[in-house]
Design a protein with these regions (language model features):
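Bacterial N-terminal signal peptides that target proteins for export
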Residues: 4-24
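Cleavable N-terminal signal peptides
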Residues: 27-28, 38
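N-terminal signal peptide c-region/cleavage motif recognized by signal peptidases
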Residues: 34-35
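Bacterial peptidoglycan biogenesis and beta-lactam-recognition machinery
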Residues: 70, 105, 153-155
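Short, surface-exposed glycine/acidic/tryptophan-bearing loops
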Residues: 85-138, 157
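Disulfide-stabilized extracellular recognition modules
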Residues: 126, 130, 134-195
Length: 195
């Protein structure tokens, strides 16, 4: 067995600097490992804090104002701005909660009601309505990008008939999973009846 020679000692001027860098690196690594952002379970509560209505409306209106290519034909649609609806946000929150409780993404709630039935039950009168759902996306940007990549979801986002929106997500407990793995998203779009 061949023995490796001992490493040459570092020049004395560089040794303290290297020790300080190694110590700093170890402290930084320890601090990051202990920080809430480094732990997946701490990264989960996006739904409770990151969905400010202004940010949601701004993000979706930015897309609607420049148009999106929703079909293979390449036709770009431009649509009027949306406004936040607390009523639609409540419907979206109820659906996200139902999906989390059922541990299943879908357009029907625990009582097997579709969107129109849920809107009516919440007292929202409408002339047009649409819903997008998703699971597993860690941020608003990620889920909107995914919806824009899907023809039918993009059609809903760019639908010129809808004027209002509500969006919600619900974090279900997914032990040891990715931060967004159990995050259920619901976007409800609607338009009040025409007068």
């Amino acid at each position: 067995m061949k023995t490796l020679p001992a490493p040459a000692p570092l020049p004395t001027a560089r040794a303290p600097r290297l020790r300080r860098l190694c110590t700093l690196g170890a402290l930084l690594a320890a601090g990051l490992a202990a920080s809430p952002a480094a732990r997946p379970e701490a990264a989960k509560p996006v739904c409770a804090t990151a969905l400010a209505p202004e940010a949601v409306v701004s993000r979706l209106n930015e897309t609607r104002s420049r148009g999106a290519i929703c079909h293979r034909s390449g036709a770009a649609a431009v649509a009027a701005p949306l406004r936040w609806s607390p009523s639609l946000a409540a419907v979206a929150a109820a659906q996200s909660r139902a999906m989390a409780e059922l541990n299943q993404m879908g357009h029907r709630d625990g009582q097997n009601r579709g969107l129109q039935e849920r809107l009516t039950a919440m007292g929202y009168r409408f002339s047009a309505a649409a819903e997008n759902v998703a699971v597993g996306y860690v941020s608003l940007e990620a889920v909107v990008d995914a919806w824009l990549d899907s023809e039918s979801h993009c059609d809903n986002l760019m639908n010129a008939k809808v004027l209002e929106l509500g969006l919600a997500c619900n974090d279900s407990a997914v032990a040891g999973g990715d931060p967004g793995e159990g995050r259920y998203w619901t976007l409800v779009l609607g338009a009040p009846p025409r007068r």
